[in-house]
């Protein structure tokens, strides 16, 4: 059972059935050398894939990879899911029969390939986002904008549709919302159920003190989630790029940092309503550009004139670590500094992750629910010390805000009589 009251894979008889399986295989790829750099999303999908293999299913995989913006993106093969085939073949259950790839994802050839599948075969269809660009190079948005025709085609390819693509579960795409609508039967895979169950621990039944750490860049993307967390957590600490709009709203000089001026009133409203619960980071490691040179330390009271704030300062970090070590539930969403290839400004996020890992060993419940910080924690080797690391940032924020995921609306519901019994 899950709080969305949607059927899960174990509610259906998948034995010997043809399963259309929607996954988020948007892995990190070195496109120049055609190498997968981070396969965490693929690994997270394995429990569902292996369950289907071990139940003799015929599996048809839908997924996207990268952002397809032009005809050149499509024709170059740069974002082709073919790069996934060997990696998947090497990682799935040894009971698999064949793993094959289709350079198409629509049409009679695809139908024939599906019909030719044997038990324990896997067929990976080409990148679903290829459907967003026509052969003439026009944007048609069939996948992104949720084409019913495309969803009907994919939904009718199998006996059952299983959605396990958590990373896009908040978006109504053809490959989730429309495909489920036209499928004979549908359910959620293990990954999505696991993601929801872990978020529910932090949202519905958290141990107190409950600390929420919110970093990242855009206030507009996170303001609703911040308000929800202010209602539920004992303390919310705001850092990362979005902190500068909050500071600007309070009258501070934030230098060269981005300020979302259209969000100033929202920031002030949050601070006025929840001021006793919110801490805004108050000192920073700065520079006048984004080079990995020696940081310039500034307290916000001194102003950041001519500077970018690239990481939190030692005093903010000391306070955050103190709060982590006294908390029993800790949720982190978003890095607190620039962590992409700039070592001098990753220290704040690194120390936060290390402190969370240490507090996990003391019995706290810890969750990281954004892609960038999750990847950083894994890079540090700390992922095994955090209770749960999510595979989706936007989906987690949407679930925190609304308690639902729009892309999953059309998945079959658990019958009311079953809900009453439980």
Curated annotation (Swiss-Prot):
Disulfide bonds: none annotated. Its EC number is 2.7.2.3. GO terms for cellular component: cytosol. Pathway: Carbohydrate degradation; glycolysis; pyruvate from D-glyceraldehyde 3-phosphate: step 2/5. Its main location: cytoplasm. It is an enzyme of class 2 (transferase). One of its GO terms (biological process) is gluconeogenesis. Substrate binds at residues 24-26, 64-67, 129, 171. The keyword Kinase applies. It comes from the Bacteria. It is found in: Cytoplasm. It holds the Pfam family PGK. GO terms for molecular function: ADP binding; ATP binding; phosphoglycerate kinase activity. Keywords: ATP-binding, Cytoplasm, Glycolysis, Kinase, Nucleotide-binding, Transferase. Monomer. Belongs to the phosphoglycerate kinase family. This is Phosphoglycerate kinase. It comes from Ureaplasma parvum serovar 3 (strain ATCC 700970). The lineage of its organism: Bacteria, Bacillati, Mycoplasmatota, Mycoplasmoidales, Mycoplasmoidaceae. The gene is pgk.
């Amino acid at each position: 059972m899950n709080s969305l009251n949607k059927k899960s894979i174990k509610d259906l008889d998948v034995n010997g059935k043809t399963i259309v399986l929607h996954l988020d295989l948007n892995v990190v790829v070195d496109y120049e050398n055609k190498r997968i750099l981070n396969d965490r999303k693929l690994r997270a999908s394995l429990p569902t894939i292996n369950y289907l293999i071990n139940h003799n299913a015929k599996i048809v995989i839908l997924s996207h990879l990268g952002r397809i913006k032009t005809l050149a993106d499509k024709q170059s093969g740069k974002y082709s899911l073919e790069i996934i085939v060997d990696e998947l073949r090497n990682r799935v259950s040894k009971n698999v029969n064949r793993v094959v790839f289709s350079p198409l994802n629509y049409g009679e050839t695809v139908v024939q390939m599906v019909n030719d599948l044997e038990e324990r075969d896997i067929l990976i269809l080409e990148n679903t986002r290829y459907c967003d660009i026509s052969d003439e190079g026009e944007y048609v948005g069939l996948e992104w904008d949720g084409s019913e025709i495309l969803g009907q085609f994919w939904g009718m390819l199998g006996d059952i549709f299983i959605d396990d693509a958590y990373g896009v579960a908040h978006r109504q795409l053809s490959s989730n919302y429309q495909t489920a609508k036209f499928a004979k039967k549908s359910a959620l895979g293990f990954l999505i159920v696991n993601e929801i169950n872990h978020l529910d621990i932090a949202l519905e039944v958290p141990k107190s003190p409950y600390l929420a750490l919110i970093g990242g860049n855009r206030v507009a993307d996170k303001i609703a989630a911040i308000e929800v967390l202010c209602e539920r957590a004992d303390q919310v600490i705001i850092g990362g790029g979005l902190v500068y709009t909050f500071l600007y709203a309070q009258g501070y000089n934030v230098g060269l940092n981005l300020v979302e001026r259209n969000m100033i009133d929202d920031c002030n409203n949050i601070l006025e309503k929840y001021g006793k619960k919110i801490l805004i980071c108050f000192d920073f490691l700065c520079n006048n550009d984004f080079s990995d040179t020696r940081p310039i330390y500034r307290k916000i009271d001194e102003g950041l004139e001519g500077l970018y704030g690239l990481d939190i300062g030692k005093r903010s970090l000391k306070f955050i670590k103190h709060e982590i070590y006294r908390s029993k539930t800790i949720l982190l969403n978003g890095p607190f500094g620039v962590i992409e290839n700039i070592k001098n400004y990753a220290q704040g996020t690194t120390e936060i992750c290390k402190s969370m890992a240490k507090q996990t060993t003391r019995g706290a419940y810890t969750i990281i629910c954004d892609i960038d910080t999750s990847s950083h924690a894994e890079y540090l080797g700390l992922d095994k010390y955090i209770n749960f690391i999510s595979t989706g940032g936007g989906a987690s924020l949407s679930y925190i805000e609304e308690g639902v995921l729009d892309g999953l609306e059309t998945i079959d519901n658990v019958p009311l009589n079953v809900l009453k019994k439980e």
